[in-house]
Design a protein with these regions (language model features):
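Structural/interface elements that position substrates and couple domains in central-metabolism enzymes
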Residues: 1-169
Length: 169
């Protein structure tokens, strides 16, 4: 989606980035430097920049040697239950930890207040960060390149996690 692809494009300017998607056509498009979403900046960067970016359907391949893994999956909101469905976020975090327990996990998905603390406890892992996105569709890469603010949250008292958060920001 636009959150994951925009952050992948931004980071791929100076880092090796492996994007994961479940849609083969999107993976093929990214690997052929064709944006699967409408975003003028992403399209321009794909055409003009030397990005260290590839995509795969194989999540384990992407997670195995990663220092950071950004989680940008849907969290649908049910207004009748006043509830965010975070099950996909939790599934992906579990897969990352199983494959690469040392990776710093950065959640970009929309989650409820207190989620980072609860998910750290659930998985007994302190290096899970939350960094909300403030992106407009069709302007996602522009908004990542020129952010109005950068916020990264983590568990308090974890100095090494604080350093990871500062590096990510």
């Amino acid at each position: 989606g636009y959150v994951g692809l925009s952050i992948a494009t931004l980071l791929a300017q100076h880092n090796e980035v492996v994007a994961v998607d479940v849609v083969p056509e999107k993976v093929a498009a990214i690997n052929n430097r064709v944006s699967p979403i409408r975003d003028e900046y992403i399209e321009r960067y794909f055409a003009e920049k030397n990005l260290n970016l590839r995509a795969t359907l194989n999540a384990e391949e992407a997670y195995r040697n990663a220092d950071y893994v950004v989680v940008a999956v849907p969290t649908n909101y049910d207004s009748h239950k006043d509830f965010f469905d975070t099950s996909l976020v939790e599934q992906v975090i579990g897969e990352i930890i199983e494959c690469n327990p040392n990776a710093v996990i950065v959640v970009k998905s929309t989650v409820p207040v207190g989620y980072t603390e609860s998910i750290c406890k659930k998985f007994n892992k302190n290096s899970i960060l939350f960094s909300p996105e403030f992106l407009r569709e069709s302007q996602a890469l522009y908004d990542n390149l020129y952010p109005s603010r950068i916020i990264v949250g983590h568990r308090l008292g974890e100095e090494n996690v604080k350093e990871s958060a500062e590096r990510f920001a």
